Protein backbone atom coordinates (compact mmCIF):
# COMPACT_ATOMS: atom_id res chain seq x y z
CA UNK A 1 0.00 0.00 0.00
CA UNK A 2 1.24 3.51 -0.78
CA UNK A 3 2.62 5.69 2.04
CA UNK A 4 0.19 8.51 1.16
CA UNK A 5 -2.80 6.17 1.61
CA UNK A 6 -1.42 4.95 4.94
CA UNK A 7 -0.91 8.51 6.07
CA UNK A 8 -4.49 9.37 5.07
CA UNK A 9 -5.83 6.52 7.25
CA UNK A 10 -3.80 7.58 10.26
CA UNK A 11 -4.60 11.31 10.07
CA UNK A 12 -5.91 12.48 13.47
CA UNK A 13 -9.06 14.58 13.77
CA UNK A 14 -8.35 18.28 14.26
CA UNK A 15 -10.66 21.03 15.32
CA UNK A 16 -12.19 22.99 12.48
CA UNK A 17 -10.41 26.16 11.64
CA UNK A 18 -11.92 29.44 12.75
CA UNK A 19 -11.48 31.15 9.38
CA UNK A 20 -11.73 30.23 5.73
CA UNK A 21 -10.29 31.20 2.40
CA UNK A 22 -12.52 34.24 2.11
CA UNK A 23 -11.32 35.58 5.45
CA UNK A 24 -7.68 35.09 4.41
CA UNK A 25 -8.13 36.84 1.06
CA UNK A 26 -10.20 39.70 2.45
CA UNK A 27 -8.21 40.34 5.60
CA UNK A 28 -4.66 41.82 5.95
CA UNK A 29 -1.73 39.54 5.23
CA UNK A 30 -0.37 38.17 8.50
CA UNK A 31 3.38 38.31 9.16
CA UNK A 32 5.55 35.35 8.33
CA UNK A 33 5.00 35.04 4.58
CA UNK A 34 1.22 34.79 4.64
CA UNK A 35 0.98 31.71 6.86
CA UNK A 36 -1.00 32.00 10.01
CA UNK A 37 -0.58 29.95 13.13
CA UNK A 38 -3.49 27.79 12.17
CA UNK A 39 -2.03 26.98 8.79
CA UNK A 40 1.38 26.34 10.29
CA UNK A 41 -0.15 24.07 12.85
CA UNK A 42 -2.20 22.29 10.21
CA UNK A 43 0.81 21.70 7.96
CA UNK A 44 2.81 20.60 10.96
CA UNK A 45 0.06 18.25 12.01
CA UNK A 46 -0.23 16.76 8.55
CA UNK A 47 3.53 16.24 8.27
CA UNK A 48 3.65 14.70 11.74
CA UNK A 49 0.74 12.43 10.90
CA UNK A 50 2.33 11.47 7.63
CA UNK A 51 5.63 10.70 9.34
CA UNK A 52 4.02 8.72 12.15
CA UNK A 53 1.81 6.81 9.74
CA UNK A 54 4.71 5.98 7.46
CA UNK A 55 6.93 4.79 10.28
CA UNK A 56 4.06 2.88 11.82
CA UNK A 57 3.43 1.03 8.59
CA UNK A 58 7.09 0.26 8.07
CA UNK A 59 7.55 -0.96 11.62
CA UNK A 60 10.42 1.42 12.40
CA UNK A 61 10.30 4.38 14.71
CA UNK A 62 12.65 7.36 14.29
CA UNK A 63 15.32 8.14 16.82
CA UNK A 64 13.49 11.28 17.96
CA UNK A 65 10.45 13.36 17.25
CA UNK A 66 9.80 17.03 16.66
CA UNK A 67 8.68 17.43 20.23
CA UNK A 68 12.04 16.29 21.56
CA UNK A 69 14.03 18.78 19.44
CA UNK A 70 15.81 21.56 21.37
CA UNK A 71 14.96 25.19 20.69
CA UNK A 72 18.28 25.93 18.95
CA UNK A 73 17.94 23.07 16.44
CA UNK A 74 16.26 25.07 13.66
CA UNK A 75 12.58 24.63 14.74
CA UNK A 76 10.68 27.90 14.40
CA UNK A 77 7.47 28.99 16.06
CA UNK A 78 4.52 26.88 15.18
CA UNK A 79 6.65 23.77 14.58
CA UNK A 80 8.11 25.00 11.28
CA UNK A 81 11.53 23.44 10.61
CA UNK A 82 14.12 25.66 8.99
CA UNK A 83 15.74 23.68 6.22
CA UNK A 84 19.22 24.90 5.10
CA UNK A 85 19.94 25.93 1.51
CA UNK A 86 21.92 22.73 0.84
CA UNK A 87 20.16 19.47 1.43
CA UNK A 88 22.12 17.47 4.03
CA UNK A 89 23.67 14.18 3.06
CA UNK A 90 22.31 11.03 4.70
CA UNK A 91 24.43 9.74 7.58
CA UNK A 92 25.39 6.07 7.20
CA UNK A 93 24.03 3.92 10.05
CA UNK A 94 26.53 2.35 12.47
CA UNK A 95 27.62 -1.22 11.94
CA UNK A 96 25.18 -3.75 13.33
CA UNK A 97 22.21 -1.36 13.38
CA UNK A 98 19.12 -1.56 11.23
CA UNK A 99 19.14 0.75 8.18
CA UNK A 100 17.34 3.99 8.86
CA UNK A 101 14.43 4.86 6.61
CA UNK A 102 14.38 8.64 6.01
CA UNK A 103 11.08 10.40 6.51
CA UNK A 104 9.48 12.78 4.05
CA UNK A 105 11.17 15.78 5.66
CA UNK A 106 14.60 14.09 5.61
CA UNK A 107 15.28 15.02 9.27
CA UNK A 108 15.58 12.83 12.34
CA UNK A 109 15.92 13.62 16.00
CA UNK A 110 18.49 15.68 17.82
CA UNK A 111 21.10 12.96 17.38
CA UNK A 112 20.51 12.90 13.64
CA UNK A 113 20.89 16.68 13.39
CA UNK A 114 24.19 16.54 15.26
CA UNK A 115 25.67 14.07 12.75
CA UNK A 116 24.44 15.73 9.56
CA UNK A 117 27.03 16.63 6.92
CA UNK A 118 26.62 19.15 4.10
CA UNK A 119 28.40 19.35 0.72
CA UNK A 120 30.23 22.55 1.65
CA UNK A 121 31.73 20.71 4.65
CA UNK A 122 33.22 18.01 2.41
CA UNK A 123 34.56 20.58 -0.05
CA UNK A 124 36.22 22.48 2.79
CA UNK A 125 37.83 19.30 4.11
CA UNK A 126 39.07 18.36 0.64
CA UNK A 127 40.46 21.88 0.14
CA UNK A 128 42.33 21.74 3.46
CA UNK A 129 43.68 18.28 2.63
CA UNK A 130 44.89 19.46 -0.80
CA UNK A 131 46.62 22.47 0.74
CA UNK A 132 48.33 20.28 3.32
CA UNK A 133 49.48 17.85 0.63
CA UNK A 134 50.83 20.68 -1.53
CA UNK A 135 52.67 22.17 1.45
CA UNK A 136 54.29 18.85 2.38
CA UNK A 137 55.12 17.80 -1.19
CA UNK A 138 58.63 19.43 -1.26
CA UNK A 139 59.57 17.47 1.87
CA UNK A 140 58.14 14.15 0.76
CA UNK A 141 60.46 11.42 -0.49
CA UNK A 142 58.42 10.63 -3.59
CA UNK A 143 59.84 11.91 -6.86
CA UNK A 144 57.85 13.04 -9.88
CA UNK A 145 57.99 10.55 -12.71
CA UNK A 146 59.31 12.03 -15.92
CA UNK A 147 61.32 14.89 -14.44
CA UNK A 148 64.84 14.73 -15.93
CA UNK A 149 66.61 16.11 -12.87
CA UNK A 150 64.82 13.84 -10.39
CA UNK A 151 64.84 10.57 -12.34
CA UNK A 152 68.55 10.48 -13.05
CA UNK A 153 70.80 8.77 -10.54
CA UNK A 154 72.89 11.12 -8.41
CA UNK A 155 76.56 11.27 -9.40
CA UNK A 156 79.01 9.33 -7.32
CA UNK A 157 81.21 11.34 -5.04
CA UNK A 158 84.79 11.29 -6.26
CA UNK A 159 87.51 10.26 -3.89
CA UNK A 160 90.05 12.94 -3.00
CA UNK A 161 93.23 12.72 -5.03
CA UNK A 162 96.21 11.42 -3.07
CA UNK A 163 99.13 13.84 -3.04
CA UNK A 164 102.71 12.59 -2.62
CA UNK A 165 105.74 14.46 -1.41
CA UNK A 166 108.52 15.53 -3.77
CA UNK A 167 110.94 12.94 -2.38
CA UNK A 168 108.41 10.14 -2.87
CA UNK A 169 107.73 11.18 -6.48
CA UNK A 170 111.46 11.40 -7.28
CA UNK A 171 112.11 7.94 -5.85
CA UNK A 172 109.16 6.47 -7.73
CA UNK A 173 110.32 8.06 -11.01
CA UNK A 174 113.85 6.78 -10.47
CA UNK A 175 112.55 3.28 -9.84
CA UNK A 176 110.25 3.45 -12.87
CA UNK A 177 113.12 4.38 -15.20
CA UNK A 178 114.93 1.24 -14.14
CA UNK A 179 111.95 -1.09 -13.88
CA UNK A 180 108.54 -0.61 -15.44
CA UNK A 181 106.88 -3.53 -13.62
CA UNK A 182 107.31 -4.52 -9.98
CA UNK A 183 106.70 -7.85 -8.34
CA UNK A 184 104.53 -8.03 -5.24
CA UNK A 185 107.55 -8.36 -2.92
CA UNK A 186 109.37 -5.46 -4.61
CA UNK A 187 106.27 -3.33 -4.46
CA UNK A 188 105.79 -4.05 -0.76
CA UNK A 189 109.43 -3.21 -0.01
CA UNK A 190 109.23 0.07 -1.96
CA UNK A 191 105.98 1.03 -0.23
CA UNK A 192 107.54 0.37 3.17
CA UNK A 193 110.63 2.42 2.28
CA UNK A 194 108.57 5.38 1.06
CA UNK A 195 105.98 5.11 3.88
CA UNK A 196 103.20 4.42 1.42
CA UNK A 197 100.62 1.69 1.12
CA UNK A 198 100.92 -1.16 -1.34
CA UNK A 199 97.78 0.02 -3.15
CA UNK A 200 99.20 3.54 -3.58
CA UNK A 201 102.42 2.23 -5.15
CA UNK A 202 100.48 -0.13 -7.41
CA UNK A 203 98.12 2.64 -8.57
CA UNK A 204 101.00 5.06 -9.18
CA UNK A 205 102.87 2.54 -11.33
CA UNK A 206 99.72 1.76 -13.33
CA UNK A 207 99.10 5.45 -14.05
CA UNK A 208 102.78 6.00 -14.85
CA UNK A 209 102.82 3.12 -17.35
CA UNK A 210 99.73 4.53 -19.06
CA UNK A 211 101.40 7.92 -19.35
CA UNK A 212 104.62 6.31 -20.60
CA UNK A 213 102.76 4.40 -23.34
CA UNK A 214 101.00 7.56 -24.49
CA UNK A 215 104.25 9.53 -24.59
CA UNK A 216 106.03 6.72 -26.44
CA UNK A 217 103.27 6.58 -29.05
CA UNK A 218 103.41 10.35 -29.54
CA UNK A 219 107.20 10.29 -29.90
CA UNK A 220 107.04 7.48 -32.44
CA UNK A 221 104.46 9.37 -34.44
CA UNK A 222 106.62 12.50 -34.43
CA UNK A 223 109.67 10.49 -35.57
CA UNK A 224 107.61 8.95 -38.37
CA UNK A 225 106.61 12.41 -39.60
CA UNK A 226 110.20 13.66 -39.46
CA UNK A 227 111.44 10.62 -41.39
CA UNK A 228 108.77 11.16 -44.04
CA UNK A 229 109.73 14.80 -44.50
CA UNK A 230 113.45 13.91 -44.73
CA UNK A 231 112.77 11.22 -47.33
CA UNK A 232 110.72 13.64 -49.41
CA UNK A 233 113.54 16.21 -49.30
CA UNK A 234 116.11 13.63 -50.39
CA UNK A 235 113.91 12.53 -53.26
CA UNK A 236 113.59 16.11 -54.47
CA UNK A 237 117.37 16.58 -54.34
CA UNK A 238 118.03 13.33 -56.23
CA UNK A 239 115.80 14.26 -59.17
CA UNK A 240 117.83 15.71 -62.16
CA UNK A 241 117.17 19.34 -62.88
CA UNK A 242 116.07 20.26 -66.40
CA UNK A 243 119.05 21.68 -68.44
CA UNK A 244 118.78 24.56 -70.89
CA UNK A 245 119.24 23.40 -74.46
CA UNK A 246 122.51 24.70 -76.05
CA UNK A 247 122.32 27.63 -78.44
CA UNK A 248 122.96 26.92 -82.08
CA UNK A 249 126.43 28.17 -83.12
CA UNK A 250 126.55 31.40 -85.05
CA UNK A 251 128.19 31.02 -88.51
CA UNK A 252 130.04 34.31 -88.07
CA UNK A 253 131.59 33.11 -84.82
CA UNK A 254 132.85 30.01 -86.53
CA UNK A 255 135.00 32.08 -88.90
CA UNK A 256 136.04 34.67 -86.27
CA UNK A 257 138.06 33.37 -83.39
CA UNK A 258 137.42 36.31 -81.11
CA UNK A 259 133.67 36.12 -81.51
CA UNK A 260 133.79 32.40 -80.97
CA UNK A 261 135.67 32.87 -77.71
CA UNK A 262 133.20 35.53 -76.61
CA UNK A 263 130.26 33.24 -77.28
CA UNK A 264 131.86 30.48 -75.29
CA UNK A 265 132.49 32.81 -72.36
CA UNK A 266 128.78 33.77 -72.24
CA UNK A 267 126.77 30.59 -72.72
CA UNK A 268 123.84 32.10 -70.83
CA UNK A 269 123.34 34.87 -73.36
CA UNK A 270 119.93 34.94 -74.99
CA UNK A 271 119.17 34.99 -78.68
CA UNK A 272 118.85 38.76 -78.82
CA UNK A 273 122.26 39.18 -77.27
CA UNK A 274 123.70 36.79 -79.79
CA UNK A 275 122.03 38.79 -82.53
CA UNK A 276 123.50 42.01 -81.20
CA UNK A 277 126.95 40.47 -81.06
CA UNK A 278 126.53 39.27 -84.62
CA UNK A 279 125.59 42.79 -85.68
CA UNK A 280 128.66 44.24 -84.02
CA UNK A 281 130.90 41.68 -85.73
CA UNK A 282 129.48 42.55 -89.11
CA UNK A 283 130.15 46.23 -88.49
CA UNK A 284 133.77 45.55 -87.63
Curated annotation (Swiss-Prot):
Q: What are the protein's GO molecular function terms?
A: DNA binding; DNA-binding transcription activator activity, RNA polymerase II-specific; DNA-binding transcription factor activity; sequence-specific double-stranded DNA binding
Composition-biased stretches, type Low complexity, lie in 40-52
List each coiled-coil range: none
UniProt entry tagged with the keyword Zinc: no
Its GO CC terms are: cytoplasm; nucleus
Q: What happens when the gene is disrupted?
A: Mice are born at the expected Mendelian ratio and show no visible phenotype at birth. After weaning, about 43% of the mice exhibit distended abdomens and growth retardation, the others remain symptomless. About 36% of the mice die between 3 and 6 weeks after birth. Affected mice display distended proximal colons and cecums. Both affected and asymptotic mice have increased numbers of myenteric neurons in ganglia in the proximal and distal colon with a concomitant increase in myenteric ganglion size.
User: What does the UniProt record say this protein does?
Assistant: Transcription activator that binds DNA elements with the consensus sequence 5'-CGGTAATTGG-3'. Binds DNA via its homeobox. Required for normal cell death of enteric neurons in the gastrointestinal tract. Required for normal development of the enteric nervous system, and for proper development of normal motility of the gastrointestinal tract.
One Gene Ontology term from the biological process aspect of the record: enteric nervous system development
In residue numbers, the region (Disordered) covers 20-52, 78-104, 140-166
Record-given protein name: T-cell leukemia homeobox protein 2
Per the database entry, where does the chain bind DNA? 157-216
Amino acid sequence: MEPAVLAAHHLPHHEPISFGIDQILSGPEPPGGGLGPGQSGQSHGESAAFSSGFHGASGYAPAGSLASLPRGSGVGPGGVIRVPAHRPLPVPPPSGAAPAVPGPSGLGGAGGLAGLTFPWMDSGRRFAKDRLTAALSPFSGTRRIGHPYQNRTPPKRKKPRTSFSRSQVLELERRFLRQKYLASAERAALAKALRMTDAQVKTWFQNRRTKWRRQTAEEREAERHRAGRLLLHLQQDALPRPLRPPLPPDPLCLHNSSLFALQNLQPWAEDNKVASVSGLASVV
